[in-house]
Curated annotation (Swiss-Prot):
Biased composition (Polar residues): 1-18, 842-871
Principal subcellular localisation of the protein: nucleus
Source species: Saccharomyces cerevisiae (strain ATCC 204508 / S288c) (Baker's yeast)
Function: Component of the NuA4 histone acetyltransferase complex which is involved in transcriptional activation of selected genes principally by acetylation of nucleosomal histone H4 and H2A. The NuA4 complex is also involved in DNA repair.
Name of the protein in question: Chromatin modification-related protein EAF1
Segments of skewed composition (Low complexity): 186-199, 825-841, 913-941, 949-965
Phosphothreonine sites (modified residues): 971
Myb-like domain location: 642-704
Coiled-coil annotated spans: none
Ranges of residues in domain HSA: 346-425
Domain of life: Eukaryota
Region annotation Disordered: where it falls in the sequence: 1-31, 115-143, 157-207, 414-440, 768-792, 822-872, 913-982
Length: 982
């Protein structure tokens, strides 16, 4: 072993030099090695994923990962070995040991840094322990005393002291465990021999030694054998308070028909039916709905698009749907032919059953014996229970609970009578047997009789009372209880009958307890003499062997009124073979052939009226589980018909039919109206019997107590709400109700047929009035017939000429319209320019221009009769316009908005005027400079043309100013918006 490290050192040094040279040659090798180390780290962590909750020391985990990477370091030429990965260990210990392992850390030795030489020597010896330690995991703890005790308990017993109290686990694990351990040892030795020198120089996470006993309690999981099912353990109780348990417990859905918390229940009924009849029908879909769905959206077309992978169960669902569709179509076909009904045909009577054969007689006898054995067993159980209760009562209360029997006179022979009483001859005393606790009777003349225990007890109690009170009845009964000999005897005088009970073997008590026994018997006797209800209940047998009708209450009498009784096997045959052996007492009881046990089912009747259950729940043919929360009213009639309409009579049957149709068809008022109108022929239908969609809707609103206007949806919701409000107001003003509730068919004013004939006269009057108001044709005007003979078919040339003439007429018409439109536009522009020039005063540029403007502007001067508006007038006019368009705003706000707008408009006009004056000055300067340049260029030429006077230029500029677009007056709406923005 000493030569191996010396030879391994130079090899490792040369290997490291080669790796460094390769690393310089291949710069990407480091990246590949790092990627490999990262994946190995992930693999190591995944293999220890089951220890995730138990890993608390991060530094220790890092050291273990570093050691694992060094074992599989490719830089040293070591390939990855799967055996170096940690494996899951299962501790095969007792439940107590498992509990201790959960709370106590078995191995917690402080980390010790070993020297290189010491580690190199101990590595091959502890390689197995190190591998086992890497695979085991424990919960950390700080209790050293508990840890030491647990270590002592896990140490194996010495062989010198004896054999193991338990069989070692290796003997049961088989050869698989041994081969695995050998392979692990060989791998650890090969690892040590190849990299002993490097591992000696590198720091390895110190691992504490594992006791040898741990190897006997660990085994590796074999993949070939399936894991055992875990044992179900009841969870710990979270809440001790029963109230909190009831609140936090989950409600269990029961299949009973009775729910005490159901507010929709009207009443409770009791159903009596056979035990094998299901009390609740399973939830299913109607055949019509299933057939409709299978034809419109079959599963065979939907399944391939809804699932990525098709299985047998999924395909079977589609096949079952096809089968059910075929069955449903066959049922519909039979119903059309009249061969399908809920009532089945008459039961077929087999003619062979009318003859009694040996087999029939044998079956009847077997049936009789079965019933006899069953009832006999019940009777024996009841009798045994009654006897056991009697013995228990005797030893509890004493002789007072015995049955009273008639006393027999002495001197006569008593034989065994028919009722089972024991009799003996006179002059022979009865032999007493102490072992069997028989009753020994001793008298003055030694005559043995059977005495009445209750009579004797009464006499004894009377004698005892006399002795206590007076002390003079020496001839009375004297009781002497001798507990030393174990014999209970009584002696009497004057030929009094005395009875004694031998309790030597059964009651062996000291003499001090005799008083307690006497008190117990006396109290029981006194309480039994006073017949109370409590004493009767205590002495009552546990089973009632008989029952009388008087003991039942009214509800129980109703249940058993028609209940068939079990009479055994009737020897007499019924006269009619097709008659059933029992009479059904309810519609829920199916008429079957034989009797059986009955079950009592308590069921609630649920109210399906609109007051409790919302009518928005559709219970129709299709989509019965879909809820519709929106109520869309039908077409609303005009309000002008409200005062003159005739009342509509709704009977109670009509209301029931209306609710039924609403549950079936939802809020489809047209369909409901069609089903409510029972019109067999095209005869006259009065307004009282007519059921329009709006009348059905209005009646629904009256019946629904929880109706709210917010439930109305759709475009007709507002008009329907207005109608209902006006109808309610009108109905309050009337003495009679428009649609009375609960109308009786015999009421002449509301539901009698005479109202129908009275309404017919009103309908005739309306038809006559309508016929009178219709316009009649005028026969005086002759009708001109069409002249078909004089009509001539035009030629193509004539057709083209007509088209050209028509186009030319259209062109002229369009041109004429354009010219007229242009003339109107010119006139409007001229009038606007003239109006603007009159409204604005001229702006003088100098003295000459002002004089000229005064001369030329005489026509544009304001007339004396024209009214001049001040600033306050303009502001008030604006405020009035604002109040007219928006009456919601106050006058103060309108006045402020008008003032603000007038100021801003005035500022804008001043800015515009200043801008125009500046432009005029710039134009004048440019013209003067242009004239000077022309004079300099042509000094010898003729005089320039006469220059326009400044007055003319100013007039032209003023005209341009007047012709410029003015600021348009805004609307009051714009004024208010600007004020609100500011």
């Amino acid at each position: 072993m000493s030569s191996r490290p010396s030879s391994a050192v130079p090899n490792s040094a040369s290997l490291s030099e080669d790796q460094s040279s390769d690393r310089s040659k291949f710069p990407k090798a480091d990246d590949l090695i790092d990627e490999r180390d990262r994946k190995l780290t992930e693999l190591y962590c995944v293999s220890r994923l089951n220890q995730l909750l138990e890993l608390t020391d991060e530094n220790k985990l890092r050291k273990e990962i570093d050691a694992f990477l060094k074992k599989n370091d490719i830089r040293r030429g070591i390939r990855f070995d799967e055996a170096s990965l940690p494996k899951l260990l299962h501790t095969a210990a007792t439940p107590i040991t498992k509990k201790k392992l959960k709370d106590v850390n078995l191995i917690n030795v402080p980390n010790q840094r070993l020297s290189d030489s010491k580690m190199s020597r101990e590595l091959p010896e502890n390689s197995e322990n190190v591998s086992v330690k890497s695979e085991s995991h424990f919960v950390p703890s700080h209790d050293n005393s508990i840890r030491e005790n647990m270590m002592d308990s896990l140490r194996p017993a010495e062989k010198t002291g004896g054999m193991w109290n338990k069989r070692p686990l290796e003997s049961t694990m088989g050869g698989e465990e041994e081969r695995h351990e050998k392979r692990q040892k060989m791998q650890s030795q090969s690892l040590e021999s190849s990299n002993n020198s490097e591992m000696a120089s590198l720091p390895i996470s110190p691992r504490p030694p594992v006791p040898n006993a741990l190897a006997h309690y660990t085994y590796y999981e074999n993949i070939e054998y399936p894991p055992a099912d875990p044992t179900e353990v009841q969870p710990a109780v979270k809440f001790k308070d029963p109230l909190i348990k009831n609140i936090m417990a989950k409600e269990i859905d029961t299949s009973d028909h009775y729910n005490e918390n159901n507010v929709d229940a009207l009443e409770t009924v009791f159903l009596l039916m056979n035990d094998y009849i299901p009390s609740k029908i399973p939830q299913a879909l109607p055949l019509a709905e299933l057939k409709y769905m299978s034809q419109t959206l079959p599963l065979i077309n939907l399944i391939p698009r809804a699932h990525k992978a098709l299985t047998t169960n999924i395909i079977n669902n589609a096949l079952n749907e096809a089968r059910i569709t075929v069955v449903g179509s066959r049922i519909e076909e039979l119903r059309r032919l009249g061969l399908w009904s809920l009532r089945q045909p008459k039961r077929f009577i087999d003619p062979w059953k009318q003859h009694n054969t040996h087999q029939n007689i044998l079956l009847e006898e077997a049936k009789w014996m079965q019933a006899d054995f069953k009832e006999g067993h019940k009777y024996k159980v009841a009798i045994c229970t009654a006897m056991a209760q009697a013995i228990k009562d005797y030893w509890t209360y004493g002789e007072i609970c015995c049955v009273k029997r008639k006393t027999l006179l002495p001197g006569k022979e008593n034989k065994l009578s028919d009722d089972g009483r024991i009799s003996e001859k006179s002059g022979r005393p009865s032999d007493t047997s102490r072992n069997d606790s028989d009753i020994s009777i001793a008298g003055k003349d030694d005559i043995g009789i059977i005495a009445n225990v209750d009579d004797i007890t009464e006499k004894e109690s009377a004698a005892a009372n006399d002795n206590d009170e007076n002390g003079k009845n020496e001839a009375g009964a004297k009781s002497d209880f001798d507990f030393a000999d174990g014999l209970l005897s009584q002696e009497g005088a004057h030929d009094q009958i005395i009875s004694s009970i031998d309790t030597k073997l059964l009651l062996k008590k000291p003499s001090s307890s005799s008083e307690v026994v006497l008190i117990q018997h006396e109290v029981a006797a006194s309480s039994a003499l006073i017949e109370t209800e409590e004493s009767k209940k205590e002495l009552a047998p546990p089973f009632k062997l008989s029952i009388f009708v008087d003991e039942l209450n009214t509800f129980e009498k109703t249940l058993i009124q028609d209940l068939p009784l079990y009479n055994g096997i009737n020897e007499e045959r019924p006269k009619k073979d097709d008659s059933l052996p029992f009479i059904p007492i309810s519609k829920s009881v199916v008429s079957l052939d034989d009797n059986g046990f009955y079950k009592l089912l308590e069921r609630q009747l649920i109210d399906e009226e609109p007051s409790i259950s919302q009518l928005s729940k559709r219970r129709g043919m299709f989509y019965g589980n879909r809820r519709n929360h929106y109520l869309r009213p039908p077409a609303v009639p005009s309000l002008r018909y409200l005062q003159n309409r005739t009342p509509t009579i709704w009977l109670s049957e009509d209301d029931q039919e209306l609710v039924k149709n609403i549950n079936t068809y939802g809020y489809n008022w047209e369909l409901i109206s069609a089903h409510m109108t029972h019109r067999l022929t095209y005869s006259y239908l009065s307004n009282i019997e007519r059921r329009t969609p709006w009348q059905c809707f209005e009646r629904f609103v009256q019946l629904n107590e929880r109706f709210n206007f917010s439930d109305l949806k759709g475009p007709r919701a507002h008009s329907a709400q207005q109608w209902l409000i006006e109808a309610h107001k009108f109905q309050q003003r009337q003495n009679r109700r428009i649609s009375p509730l609960g109308v009786n068919t015999e009421s002449i004013q509301r539901g009698h047929r005479r109202l129908r004939w009275a309404s017919m006269f009103e309908a005739i009057r309306k038809c006559m009035k309508k016929r009178e108001n219709t316009p009649r044709p005028n026969p005086t005007q002759p009708r001109k017939p069409l002249d078909c003979k004089n009509m001539k078919v035009p030629t193509p040339a004539e057709m083209s000429l007509l088209k050209a003439q028509r186009d030319e007429a259209l062109r002229r018409d369009i041109q004429l319209r354009r010219t007229v439109k242009n003339r109107l536009q010119q006139r409007q522009q001229q009038s606007q320019q003239a109006h603007s020039s009159r409204a604005q005063s001229p702006i003088p540029s100098n003295g000459k221009s002002s004089s000229n403007l005064a001369r030329n502007g005489q026509a544009s001067a304001p007339r004396p009769n024209q009214k001049q508006y001040t600033e306050q007038d303009i502001i008030e006019s604006y405020s009035r316009k604002l109040l007219e368009q928006k009456p919601d705003i106050g006058p103060e706000m309108a006045l402020k908005a008008a003032k603000n707008y007038y100021r801003t408009l005035r500022e804008q006009q001043q800015q515009l005027k200043q801008h125009q004056i500046q432009q005029q000055r710039q134009q004048l300067q440019e013209e003067s400079s242009h004239v000077q340049q022309l004079q300099q260029l042509q000094p010898g030429s003729q005089a320039p043309p006469p220059k326009s006077s400044p007055s003319q230029s100013s007039l032209s500029n003023i005209s341009n100013i007047n012709s410029a677009p003015r600021i348009k007056s805004p609307t009051p709406q714009e004024i208010l918006q600007r004020f609100q923005k500011q």
